[in-house]
A protein has these predicted regions:
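Gram-negative bacterial Sec-dependent N-terminal signal peptides
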Residues: 1-21
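Gram-negative outer-membrane beta-barrel domains
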Residues: 19-183
Length: 183
């Protein structure tokens, strides 16, 4: 009976040992704070039936965006949690967007990340559309140089390519792509 209990205790502790790694898959510390900044570009297209309403010709607000982001990730072994802020200059029907969101995800490969996000976004519209704020949800992936075969060229730099898509109150489609610099 003692051997059975000992074997069960050892097997039960194996997943915990896997989470208590000294380093993450990309070689960075498994626990700490990872600040980052980035520049993204994309497009924000709103539904016709959103709280923004429509102008007389039955159009919907939409426009290209250039976005600056800044945030921190807290690595927790193979997963991470973080917070991110953004400020975006819009074109066409969107003047400015800005917001803050929480992120949670997993490390993927040598230097990549897969994440989900949720937070609050403010949208300042133009061309007759009102300004609004609401919840924003999204998913994305960051791909590091080692994952695309550039490890020898870039060494251990913190540059990652990011692709993400978000939705504003499930009424919009907001694909974005850009470069993120981790420190």
């Amino acid at each position: 009976m003692k051997k059975l209990l000992l074997a069960a205790a050892i097997l039960g502790s194996l997943p915990v040992a896997a989470l208590a790694q000294d380093t993450a898959p990309d070689g960075s510390e498994a626990f700490g704070i990872e600040p980052y900044v980035g520049v993204l570009g994309g497009y924000h297209s709103f539904d016709r039936n959103t709280e923004f309403g429509s102008i007389p010709n039955d159009s919907k607000p939409s426009g290209a965006l250039i976005s600056g982001i800044a945030g921190i990730n807290v690595p927790l072994g193979p997963v991470f949690a973080g917070v991110e802020g953004n400020a975006s200059k819009g074109f066409d029907d969107i003047d400015w967007e800005y917001g803050v969101r929480g992120r949670f995800g997993a490390r993927a490969g040598e230097s990549g990340m897969i994440f989900g996000s949720a937070g609050y976004q403010w949208v300042n519209a133009k061309n007759g559309f009102p300004n609004r704020s609401d919840w924003m949800y999204g998913v994305g992936v960051e791909i590091g140089p080692k994952d695309i075969g550039l490890g020898g060229v870039t060494g251990s730099s913190g540059i990652r390519l990011r692709v993400q898509t978000e939705t504003y109150d499930f009424d919009t489609f907001r694909p974005m792509a850009g470069v993120v610099f981790h420190f």
